[in-house]
């Protein structure tokens, strides 16, 4: 196993390019619970270029019917990134003030995590994000309504 550095600029460039449109290589989950985590996974993939194909616990996308739950599910992505010690990206939970470009923010309503955002900039220290479902381009985190936000710092990825 070797470490792959996360290409933050590639993740940000992807997010900025596709924030208000859909990459035809991926299914649009807007009509099936939301596309935010699918979009965030695409951005992370752009930054690491490696998937984890373990059937029940991995992070991958081949098609709408052949994908890991972690690719498009908010809580599943969170669990995968924070617990992965194998192939694919991995993350640590940090404070919002320690976020970097290409990192993720997940919003919680007090009961569950329900939305995933990609950090694409900062304004006076406040994260600016891109997201799908409620499509957003360089939107300030301050404009969202949530009980609390969890910051996921993408450390890198593992690969064979």
Model-predicted segments: where are they?
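N-terminal capping segments
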Residues: 1-72
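Residue-level signal for the start and early helices of compact helical domains
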Residues: 20, 68, 90, 143-145
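...with weaker cross-activation on analogous glycine-rich loops/strands in unrelated enzymes
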Residues: 61-132
């Amino acid at each position: 196993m070797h470490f792959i550095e996360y290409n933050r600029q590639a993740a940000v460039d992807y997010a900025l390019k596709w924030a208000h449109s859909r990459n035809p290589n991926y299914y649009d989950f807007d009509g099936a619970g939301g596309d935010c985590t699918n979009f965030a996974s695409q951005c992370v993939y752009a930054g690491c270029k490696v998937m984890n194909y373990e059937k029940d616990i991995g992070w991958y996308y081949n098609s709408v019917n052949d994908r890991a739950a972690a690719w498009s599910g908010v809580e599943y992505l969170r669990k995968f990134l924070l617990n992965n010690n194998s192939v694919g990206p991995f993350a640590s939970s940090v404070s919002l003030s320690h976020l970097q470009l290409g990192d993720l923010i997940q919003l919680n309503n007090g009961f569950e995590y329900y939305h995933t955002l990609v950090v694409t900039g900062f304004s006076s220290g406040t994260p600016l994000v891109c997201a799908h479902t409620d499509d957003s381009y360089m939107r300030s985190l301050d404009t969202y309504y949530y009980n609390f936000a969890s910051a996921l710092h993408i450390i890198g990825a593992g690969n064979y």
